[in-house]
Amino acid sequence: MTRLPILLLLISLVYATPFPQTSKKIGDDATLSCNRNNTNDYVVMSAWYKEPNSIILLAAKSDVLYFDNYTKDKISYDSPYDDLVTTITIKSLTARDAGTYVCAFFMTSPTNDTDKVDYEEYSTELIVNTDSESTIDIILSGSTHSPETSSEKPDYIDNSNCSSVFEIATPEPITDNVEDHTDTVTYTSDSINTVSASSGESTTDETPEPITDKEEDHTVTDTVSYTTVSTSSGIVTTKSTTDDADLYDTYNDNDTVPSTTVGGSTTSISNYKTKDFVEIFGITALIILSAVAIFCITYYIYNKRSRKYKTENKV
């Protein structure tokens, strides 16, 4: 008896011959039954399962045990006629209930004292239809439904009496008066802001000449500046010319603006370059290094004399 559940799990027989089919609609109840051929042996246990490997129930006489979430409310079991027939009723069919159901009989001979168990199984296919007409009936009858076609042609419409008039409007020419804007820039040498200063203030008026740019050729022009110094002793005007190219030279150019004489005094304006700062830094570093060298030499001489003096005192 302990080996019967193991034998049930090893059931995998598949028949090539077609088996009965039952077709029902969704919501109906389906009753599936099977009869055993061996009526002489004693039925030990009967079983129902759904392929591929879903066990529904195991029954021994009036005792029924359900598996895989199946309940008696969904599937009822009956075995009339002294276990010659086993029947199940599936209630309220759904699409998931469709499939192949297998009933099995486990039998033993009442005259045989051995533990030999005979086995029989039968399959039934349950088809659940979603429409009122059975799918099996459609396949067996060979009927096909083709869309209806209409051979009627629409009435011919005579368009000879119809005319369409299209009015095409010709737009008037659009005149776009474009004003010619001319920008005139007048440079006069007389436009000089004069600062009357008896205090010695100076006014610088620069009148740059136009720079011509044609076909990516840049022409660098000179800038003429006038420096006017007004003092109580007189007015001195100095003209200086600066080339734009000189603005990019930071090492080799050492320009000095000519001195301006005001009332007998001379003032010199110098432009310091990077080179000048480098020279100053070099001279300063040289002085510091010289001072360090002198300090080291002095310390060495003093230390040597101190050691010599200590040695003489010990002796």
UniProtKB/Swiss-Prot annotation:
Keywords assigned by UniProt, alphabetized: Disulfide bond, Early protein, Glycoprotein, Hemagglutinin, Host membrane, Immunoglobulin domain, Late protein, Membrane, Signal, Transmembrane, Transmembrane helix, Viral envelope protein, Virion
Region (Disordered): 191-213
GO cellular component, one term: viral envelope
Domain spans labelled Ig-like V-type: 17-121
Compartment(s) where it occurs, according to its Swiss-Prot or TrEMBL record: Virion membrane; Host membrane
Main location: virion
Compositional bias per record (Polar residues), positions renumbered to this chain: 191-202
Induction: Expressed in the early phase of the viral replicative cycle.
Glycosylation site positions: N37, N69, N112, N161, N254
A Pfam family matched in the record: V-set
Positions on the Virion surface side per record topology: 17-279
Transmembrane segments annotated in the record for this chain: 280-303
Record's function text: Prevents cell to cell fusion by interacting with and directing the viral OPG040 protein on the host plasma membrane. The OPG185-OPG040 complex associates with components of the entry fusion complex (EFC) presumably to avoid superinfection and syncytium formation. Via its interaction with C3/VCP protein, protects the infected cell and probably also the extracellular enveloped virus from complement attack.
Summary of subunit composition and partner proteins: Heterodimerizes with OPG040. The heterodimer OPG185-OPG040 interacts with components of the entry fusion complex OPG143 and OPG094. Heterodimer with C3/VPC protein; disulfide-linked.
Family that this chain belongs to: Belongs to the orthopoxvirus OPG185 family.
Protein's UniProt name: Protein OPG185
Organism of origin: Vaccinia virus (strain Ankara) (VACV)
Classification of source organism: Viruses, Varidnaviria, Bamfordvirae, Nucleocytoviricota, Pokkesviricetes
Gene transcribed to yield this protein: OPG185
